[in-house]
């Protein structure tokens, strides 16, 4: 396809497919990634080893992010790339129950992250392309992911408590096969004319607005990575069970629903920059509270802040990256944005694994809250001076 926008009727026909794609990929997170670090600990790995696995996976995802985005921009075949990545990830997931050593877990995590990254990047780029000028309505389609996560995480904790965590892997494989089949229903994306991709890319990432954006995302996502990777382990260490982990994760997703649904109107009212800035303050509050909770059940209430923290950040950041990119580098920009989050995950995996072992989970969360507040200050001081081009 060449550089023409999708017409309204064409977009209306295909946008519901993206909602199902979000549903399946986040249902996969609900049954797998929510409990993956708990599974590692149950296999005898230490917090530092879990952190190193997270580092390796994030390194792989960071390298893959730009590759998948650039490949999609050049070929327009996001649907085939997503489907192929999902099938590969489902096959790799089935190998996890057969592995028992740290080094094999490390290798699997690298391969798994490489292929799953394609879906996370390209589903966003595809949805934004289909929305066209209505990109602020992205949240209404991403809402499918919140629903998928709620249904999966709410049931998975109770089920795994009875049948064992090993069953998360075949469950994930089935979900990702459904994702792959759904992805094949999408159209090819437009291939926008324009050479000199490298020069355009260099100009984009040298913008002061992009540099500040990437720095603040890095600081917040380093902290977010700690809460993702170690909240479940913290709940366990405080006496909670798999069901409580599932309930806490479910409440975070439930809190997303109204924010996802109304994110378009809220973004129009607040603006991308103010929404992104506000999210950093809520992340400071949310992650700081993890560091002071006296009982694991407090995680349920704290996770209600997921709406104004995670939803505000993700939806505004996806649009912010898209806004700064030229037409022929939209998927590449999403890849670079997610490469930044993966770089943060690399640092966060090692840093949080070390802090968990050395200073405990409470102090770890407090340090991470400071990182979020630093991002809030930096972005607040510069958001008006350095605006996206």
Question: What do the PLM-derived regions correspond to, one by one?
Answer:
Residues 23, 92, 102-120, 218, ...:
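Hydrophobic core of transmembrane alpha-helices in multi-pass small-molecule transporters
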Residues 80-94, 173, 274-289:
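Structural signature of the two symmetry-related core transmembrane helices
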Residues 110-144:
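Cytoplasmic helix-loop-helix junction between adjacent transmembrane helices
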Residues 167-184, 365-381:
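Symmetry-related core transmembrane helices of the 12-TM Major Facilitator Superfamily/SLC fold
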